[in-house]
């Protein structure tokens, strides 16, 4: 029992026990030599040294070295030395193996500072990593820590290495084509994987979230997301209560997939949380992309780190104080007296798209959704550009290629900025069609309602059995009753059959349909399949329906806009090769927005307004 307790305490305790036992045996044998006078040199120190040297060397003395008792006692010491050496080697080997296993399991503590922590391992993880690595290309080495228990650390490491190698290969090919310098991701970003439950304090502290820059909660399930937010918020609150002066606290960025869980998430995270409502984000992009061809590409480019990016810049960083510029009439004008629109004409490497005053309000109001904190505030976007003066703004939202210092000239740019002319938008009266029902349907209809003319007809096409099941839900019926600005017509139709779709679209009253939105089939899935397989099946159905619509578009309706919701980038690329429709990959959009907000918290407001 004593030995069991000692072994449970680890390698150090076992080595100490072995050392004490060996010393005791050496002293015991030396005392026998002294007591019986078996050694020629009866000095106690000499006897102890003889026993110790014999034990260490494990060398049995010969008969010529002393008396028979001396040879016998030192022979026992040599045997004890053999046992000591063997057991010591075994203990050290076991300790090293245990430590290596700990490292393999990803339980080692992270010692980095100002890093990003991603909690959760799924398909979106790689999209987030790609965005972070892209954003780090013009920065010094940054660290990303990924924590989850979905698979072993070694497997996560292998997948990350493979992913980075594939991305670098693709980027190198594009760089050669454009004659640009290729920079591998690994030169600016290191990724550390850790194994553990994302909601456990010990695992979170192992990732050193106390000293990280931001935390991205990347769980598929809303309940799990709220648990992780609560755990992270607890650690951040402990840091706040510790009262360390000058300590910049991390914050949490998360996505909620069901709008009903927004309040719970916000209350769990408090002022340390920036939460994105996935249905609202995706439905807004889907609905607006259906208005004009190519708009989805604009959204995608705006949200990700490729090309020009949106930066949140303090006015002091632009060094406007006391600066004067030459106006169109030749007079000198103080730069603080310019409007934001006028200021843009003196910027050489950036474009201001908005501005704000004061600090962003992160206060939590119980019963209100996270994004509502901006409802009563003046817009920070372009509509205020001609009315808002530079002196009335503390921060700018700037669109530029890299986060280099913004250059202000005394004279206007040679390429003049054309004034944005607001056009009176006249809502069309032509009907729209939505192919398939999904978790986004109600929210998409609400977004369409905001810009379609009153009583515009919207057809919702779905297979009879699925449509009946969907409309039988009382909550769905309650939400449908709230949609009053457009007329909904539910059409039971075999949308997976080309002939059925063609027959419907070829009817004279249906040829006026202006746009078709294909929603991902994520409501009626095979529960026996994994989530990844379910998404693959949904994308396959989307591509099949797209091909049918594309043929109908070519034969009957050349002006038809088609917008598709996809789950995977690979499937989007496959569909893009044969058509020029608008594609929105939900996981990519969510990953891009989460990453941008995790890097600069204040960007959440402008993304909400966009």
Annotate each PLM feature:
Residues 1-610:
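Cytosolic regulatory regions of ion transport systems
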């Amino acid at each position: 029992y004593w030995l069991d307790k000692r072994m449970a305490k680890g390698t150090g305790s076992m080595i100490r026990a072995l050392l004490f036992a060996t010393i005791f045996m050496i002293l015991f044998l030396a005392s026998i030599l002294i007591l019986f006078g078996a050694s020629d040199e009866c000095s106690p120190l000499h006897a102890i040294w003889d026993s110790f040297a014999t034990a260490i060397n494990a060398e049995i003395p010969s008969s010529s070295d002393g008396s028979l008792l001396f040879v016998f006692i030192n022979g026992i010491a040599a045997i004890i030395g053999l046992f000591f050496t063997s057991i010591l080697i075994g203990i050290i080997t076991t300790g090293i193996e245990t430590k290596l296993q700990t490292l393999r399991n990803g339980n080692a503590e992270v010692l980095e500072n100002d890093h990003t922590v991603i909690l959760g391992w799924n398909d979106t993880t790689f999209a987030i990593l790609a965005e972070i690595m892209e954003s780090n290309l013009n920065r010094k080495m940054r660290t990303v820590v990924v924590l989850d228990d979905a698979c072993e650390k070694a497997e996560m490491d292998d997948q990350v290495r493979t992913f980075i190698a594939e991305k670098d290969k693709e980027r190198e090919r594009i760089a050669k084509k454009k004659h640009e310098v290729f920079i591998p991701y690994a030169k600016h970003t290191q990724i550390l994987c850790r194994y553990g439950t994302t909601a456990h304090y010990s695992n979170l502290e192992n990732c050193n979230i106390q000293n990280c820059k931001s935390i991205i909660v990347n769980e598929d399930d809303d309940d799990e997301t709220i648990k992780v937010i609560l755990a992270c918020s607890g650690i951040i609150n402990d840091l706040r209560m510790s009262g360390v002066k000058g300590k910049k606290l991390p914050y949490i960025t998360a996505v909620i997939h069901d709008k009903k869980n927004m309040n719970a998430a916000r209350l769990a995270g408090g002022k340390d949380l920036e939460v994105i409502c996935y249905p609202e984000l995706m439905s807004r992009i889907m609905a607006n992309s259906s208005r004009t061809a190519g708009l989805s590409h604009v959204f995608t480019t705006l949200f990700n780190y490729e090309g020009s990016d949106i930066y949140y810049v303090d006015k002091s960083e632009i060094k406007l104080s006391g600066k004067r510029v030459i106006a169109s009439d030749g007079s000198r004008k103080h730069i603080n007296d310019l409007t934001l629109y006028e200021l843009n004409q003196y910027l050489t490497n950036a474009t201001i798209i908005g501005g704000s005053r004061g600090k962003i309000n992160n206060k939590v109001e119980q019963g209100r959704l996270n994004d509502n904190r901006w409802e009563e505030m003046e817009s920070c976007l372009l509509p205020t550009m001609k009315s808002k003066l530079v002196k009335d703004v503390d921060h700018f939202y700037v669109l530029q290629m890299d986060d280099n210092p913004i250059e202000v000239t005394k004279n206007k740019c040679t390429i003049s900025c054309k004034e944005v002319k607001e056009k009176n938008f006249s809502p069309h009266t032509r009907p729209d069609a939505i192919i398939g029902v999904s978790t986004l349907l109600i929210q998409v209809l609400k977004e369409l309602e905001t810009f379609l003319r009153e009583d515009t007809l919207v057809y919702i096409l779905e297979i009879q059995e699925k449509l009946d099941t969907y409309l039988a839900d009382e909550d769905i019926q309650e939400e449908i009753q709230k949609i009053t600005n457009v007329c909904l017509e539910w059409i039971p139709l075999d949308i997976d059959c080309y002939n059925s779709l063609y027959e419907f679209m070829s009817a004279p009253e249906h040829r006026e349909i202006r746009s078709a939105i294909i929603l991902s089939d994520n409501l009626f899935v095979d529960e026996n399949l994994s989530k990844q397989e379910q998404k693959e099946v949904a994308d396959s159905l989307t591509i099949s329906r797209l091909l049918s619509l594309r043929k109908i578009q070519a034969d009957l309706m050349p002006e038809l806009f088609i917008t598709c919701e996809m789950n995977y980038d690979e499937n989007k690329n496959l569909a893009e090769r044969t058509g020029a429709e608008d594609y929105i990959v939900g996981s990519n959009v969510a990953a891009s927005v989460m990453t941008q907000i995790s890097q600069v918290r204040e960007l959440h407001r402008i993304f909400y307004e966009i």
